[in-house]
Structure formats: structure tokens, C-alpha cells
């Protein structure tokens, strides 16, 4: 549970959700090594102050199922391909973290013997307690579920204090701030307000899952240096949904 002392992090354990697109940097496709290294520094700063970090990464930088689905690709096949993309991203992130001397384990919701370990909740929690970063890949292992839903699910399973969703904007707005200059930023929202206002922060399944299990969500801009440390130590960043 969150701690109250100002000398300690507010959160003991967090689940960080990164979009695959965030790994592209300024490119249109793939993985930017500079972004990986910067993410590793941010995550390493949390480990350094005793925060346990679980990580879920999307796959949109390597595979965009929606476009191929519209062109006739079977939805289930597309989702399976997307799961494989998240595993590739997880392996890349593990490499960056381990180059920064941060012990990291990648677990997959689908068996991939010899490449990554099969997801085991109890093992994951033990690793987190030992100070390892645990990357949860392959989504939930089921088609029709997004990586946002996977992030909320894993966050609930590992009893994280919050799910932190990294985006390209500094919180949740009433409209897309890049398209609407009158868009208003929200500092705090309830789950039901997110659903009623159709703000599109996460998909319906993810929001309902978080609401039903009382999992706080924090939406923030990952491009702001030091943002993760500020969040876990209680500073105001982005939008809190609870």
C-alpha cells in the first residue's frame, strides 16, 4: 500500500505501461535504442529508491493489427502477431535494463520455451521483492484484449499500488490537445467520469477492471525527465484516476 512518510516513496510497487509507439522515438517504425536507454535510466531511478517495478509494453511500433484487419487479416491471427511484437519489445527493454545493471526477467502469457519464461504470478512477485524488474509480455495471452487490459490485469495480480500509463501528453484532456487548443486537462478523475465522458484513456475493459478492483491509474507524459521518480514520491504529475 502507499506509504505516508515524505522520506519514502508513496508507492512500494507499480505496474508501468508503455506503448509500443513510445519506443519508436522520432522514427516511424521499430525501436530507438536511445529511447530504451532513457527508459532504463528512469526505471533504474525507481529501483534505486526501493520501488518494485513491473512493466507491460505494447507492440504498435512493430505490428499494427488494425490496418491489416481492415485489409482482411483474421482478427485472432492479428492479435497473436501483436502478442509476439510485445515479446520482442520486452526482450529489447530487458537488454537495455541489463546494460544498466538492472536485473530483469521477461515473462510471457504464452509459452515460448528457450526465449522467455512462461508467466507465473508467484515467481513474478518473488522477483519483484528481490528488486528485479519483471516485464510481462504477450498481453493476457488471449485475443480481443489490449495491452492496457493486460497492464491492469497484471497490476491487480501482483498487488501493485498503481498502474502508471505513459503517453505522449501530460495527462488526460477533454479532447485531443494537439487538435483542439481549447482542450482542458484533468488533474483528477473517477473511473465513472472517464467512462461517462468517453475520454478514451484506456479501453472499456481496462477501466472497468481497474474500477472493480480499486486500482488507481496515473496517466502521464513519459518524455518529461525524472517523471517516474516524481510520481512515486507523491508529486503531482499527469492525471490520477481512482
Swiss-Prot record:
GO cellular component terms given for this protein: cytosol
Family statement: Belongs to the UMP kinase family.
Organism of derivation: Marinobacter nauticus (strain ATCC 700491 / DSM 11845 / VT8)
The keyword rRNA-binding is assigned to this record: no
Role: Catalyzes the reversible phosphorylation of UMP to UDP.
HAMAP family: PyrH_B
Name of the featured protein: Uridylate kinase
TM regions (residue ranges): none
Free-text activity regulation comment from the record: Inhibited by UTP.
Catalytic activity: UMP + ATP = UDP + ADP
SUPFAM superfamilies: Carbamate kinase-like
InterPro entries found in the cross-reference section: AceGlu_kinase-like_sf, Asp/Glu/Uridylate_kinase, Uridylate_kinase, Uridylate_kinase_bac
Molecular functions per Gene Ontology: ATP binding; UMP kinase activity
Binding of UMP, residues: 59, 79, 140-147
Enzyme class, UniProt record, top EC level: transferase
Top-level taxon in the UniProt lineage: Bacteria
Location in or out of the cell: Cytoplasm
PANTHER family linked to this entry: URIDYLATE KINASE (PTHR42833), URIDYLATE KINASE PUMPKIN, CHLOROPLASTIC (PTHR42833:SF4)
EC number: 2.7.4.22
GO terms (BP aspect): 'de novo' CTP biosynthetic process; UDP biosynthetic process
Listed pathway(s): Pyrimidine metabolism; CTP biosynthesis via de novo pathway; UDP from UMP (UMPK route): step 1/1
Keyword Glycoprotein: no
Main location: cytoplasm
Amino acid at each position: 500500500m502507499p506509504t505516508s512518510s515524505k522520506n519514502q516513496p508513496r508507492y512500494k510497487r507499480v505496474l508501468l505501461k508503455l506503448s509500443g509507439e513510445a519506443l519508436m522515438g522520432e522514427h516511424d517504425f521499430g525501436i530507438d535504442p536511445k529511447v530504451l536507454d532513457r527508459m532504463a535510466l528512469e526505471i533504474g531511478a525507481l529501483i534505486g529508491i526501493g520501488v518494485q517495478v513491473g512493466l507491460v509494453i505494447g507492440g504498435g511500433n512493430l505490428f499494427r493489427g488494425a490496418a491489416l484487419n481492415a485489409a482482411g487479416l483474421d482478427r485472432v491471427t492479428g492479435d497473436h502477431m501483436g502478442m509476439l511484437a510485445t515479446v520482442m519489445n520486452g526482450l529489447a527493454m530487458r537488454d537495455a535494463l541489463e546494460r544498466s545493471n538492472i536485473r530483469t526477467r521477461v515473462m510471457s502469457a504464452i509459452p515460448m520455451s528457450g526465449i522467455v519464461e512462461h508467466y507465473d504470478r508467484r515467481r513474478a512477485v518473488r522477483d519483484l521483492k528481490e528488486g528485479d524488474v519483471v516485464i510481462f509480455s504477450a498481453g493476457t495471452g488471449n485475443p480481443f484484449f489490449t495491452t492496457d487490459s493486460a497492464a491492469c490485469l497484471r497490476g491487480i495480480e501482483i498487488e501493485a499500488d498503481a498502474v502508471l500509463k505513459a503517453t505522449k501528453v501530460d495527462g488526460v484532456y477533454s479532447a485531443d490537445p494537439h487538435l483542439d487548443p481549447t482542450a482542458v486537462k484533468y488533474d483528477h478523475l473517477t473511473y465513472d467520469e472517464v467512462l461517462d465522458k468517453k475520454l478514451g484513456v484506456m479501453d472499456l475493459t481496462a477501466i472497468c477492471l481497474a474500477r472493480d478492483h480499486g486500482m488507481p491509474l496515473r496517466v502521464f507524459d513519459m518524455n518529461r525527465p525524472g517523471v517516474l521518480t516524481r510520481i512515486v514520491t507523491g508529486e503531482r504529475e499527469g492525471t490520477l484516476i481512482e
